[in-house]
Each structure stands twice: as structure tokens, then as C-alpha cells.
């Protein structure tokens, strides 16, 4: 258990740092204000799959809070929570044991993408906008538009780049029973 907690702490630090750096360097704007294509969610998917839902939550939450603080001066807490929840849900989208054994085929890809799509819909289409209305008194039409666009572009980003990262990772793992004794 202690070894696992050390892995989670290290993964959280590295993952949060990558979340900040990628979010800072690769930020592709959309026509909707304050909404952009964010490639760090693909990395969040990889780390969440490898280290579990808790690490995923911490990486998303801490990474987003730091990114907002560095780029905008203060975190937008409802969306910071959203990133944490995305990491949490993404951690449930992949069977970690299978992935570390090199198994990430069509069945696993479909499962992962169903989970990530539903998570994006719930987090960015409902939780973050409702939080913006309740916490920041933002106009509903504005925040739901931002949430829907963010959810769609994040779902697409994770479907393409996140799936690719997971597939590439699985390809580096040796499947059990594939080594022969000579």
C-alpha cells in the first residue's frame, strides 16, 4: 500500500506539471470566448488510466488550479473541479491491469471512449456550468454554451489523442505468454 501511495504522489506531481505545461503551450482557441482545445486532457487520460482515479482527480484538480493561477492570476474553481472529476472518471474508463499487460484492443477502446464521452457530457455540460451559475452568478446561456463546446472538443481530443497515447503505451508492454523459452 505504501509503495502505491508513493507512486500516486509522484504521478500526481509529474502529471500536474505536464497538465500545466501542455495547457500553457498548446491552447487552441475556439469561436466561443474562454473556451479552447486543450491537449492536456489526453495526457490526463493516460495518467488516470495508469495510476487510477485518485491520481487522475489530483492531477486534473492541481494541474488546472496551477494553470489558471499562472495564466489568469486566479483559478476558476468550478472548472478546476471539473478537471479533477474528469481525471477521476477517466481512471474508471480503462482496466489498468489489462493496459499494463499490453491489452488495449477494440473492446477496450470502445469502453474507454464511452466512459470519457459520458464524463465530458456530465462534467462540462452540467457540473461546470451549474457551478458557474451558483458560485459566480454567470449567465446560464453563456456558461452552458462554453460547457457544451468544451465538452465536445475535450471528448474529441481524448478520443483521438488520448486513445492514441493509451494504444501506444499498451504496445510497449509485453503481453503475458508472448515470450518463449529457447
Swiss-Prot record:
It is a multi-pass membrane protein. It holds the Pfam family ECF-ribofla_trS. The keyword Plastid does not apply. One of its GO terms (cellular component) is plasma membrane. Keywords: Cell membrane, Membrane, Transmembrane, Transmembrane helix. It comes from Lactococcus lactis subsp. cremoris (strain NZ9000). This is UPF0397 protein LLNZ_01795. The keyword Membrane applies.
Amino acid at each position: 500500500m505504501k509503495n502505491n501511495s508513493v507512486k500516486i504522489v509522484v504521478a500526481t506531481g509529474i502529471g500536474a506539471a505536464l497538465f500545466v505545461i501542455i495547457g500553457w503551450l498548446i491552447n487552441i482557441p475556439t469561436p466561443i470566448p474562454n473556451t479552447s482545445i486543450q491537449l492536456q486532457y489526453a495526457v490526463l487520460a493516460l495518467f488516470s488510466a495508469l495510476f487510477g482515479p485518485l491520481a487522475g482527480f489530483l492531477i486534473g484538480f492541481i494541474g488546472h488550479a496551477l494553470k489558471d493561477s499562472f495564466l489568469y492570476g486566479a483559478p476558476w474553481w468550478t472548472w478546476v473541479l471539473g478537471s479533477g472529476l474528469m481525471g477521476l472518471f477517466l481512471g474508471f474508463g480503462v482496466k489498468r491491469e489489462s493496459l499494463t499487460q499490453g491489452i488495449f484492443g477494440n473492446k477496450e477502446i470502445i469502453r474507454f471512449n464511452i466512459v470519457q464521452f459520458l464524463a465530458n457530457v456530465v462534467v462540462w455540460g452540467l457540473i461546470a456550468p451549474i457551478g458557474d451559475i451558483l458560485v459566480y452568478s454567470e449567465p446560464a446561456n453563456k456558461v452552458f454554451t462554453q460547457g457544451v463546446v468544451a465538452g465536445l472538443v475535450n471528448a474529441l481530443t481524448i478520443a483521438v489523442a488520448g486513445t492514441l497515447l493509451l494504444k501506444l503505451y499498451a504496445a510497449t508492454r509485453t503481453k503475458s505468454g508472448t515470450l518463449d523459452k529457447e
